[in-house]
Curated annotation (Swiss-Prot):
The lineage of its organism: Bacteria, Bacillati, Bacillota, Bacilli, Bacillales. This is Protein VraC. It comes from the Bacteria. InterPro entries: UCP032370_VraC.
Length: 120
């Protein structure tokens, strides 16, 4: 998996195998249709070094917004870009907003924006 890291942004090549998608669908009792279920993209976040700083912090996911233009197919390689949209201190809470963009051959497939909070 290739990795490109800039300040506040990281790019990785990602892929969902047929076997892992079938297992995910079976586990959640979802009909398997050779497409990646949107919520399966949650497994991508921990793969990014940019997101690793949260691995030992007690963060809370507050909001998720998803825009899908093209469904992700199994066994295809995609370019996933995670970037920090914002970080704000509000009293004793830090609000983090991250965006995950998934593209195939420069074609926009999916965008996931998530808002996390950390209570200090």
């Amino acid at each position: 998996m290739q990795l490109y890291l800039k300040d506040g942004m990281e790019i990785r090549e990602v892929q969902f195998t047929n076997e892992e998608v079938q297992n995910y669908c079976e586990l959640l009792n979802i009909k398997y249709d050779h497409y990646v279920p949107t919520l399966m993209c949650a497994k991508l976040w921990p793969q990014f070094e940019l997101f690793q700083s949260f691995s030992k912090k007690p963060i809370i996911l507050k909001e998720t917004h998803i825009k899908t233009q093209h469904q992700l197919q199994v066994d295809c390689t995609y370019e996933a870009t995670l970037h920090k949209v914002s970080q704000k201190l509000i009293k004793n809470i830090i609000k983090y907003t991250y965006g995950l963009e998934i593209n195939k051959d420069k074609k926009h497939c999916m965008y996931i924006k998530q808002i996390f909070i950390e209570v200090r």
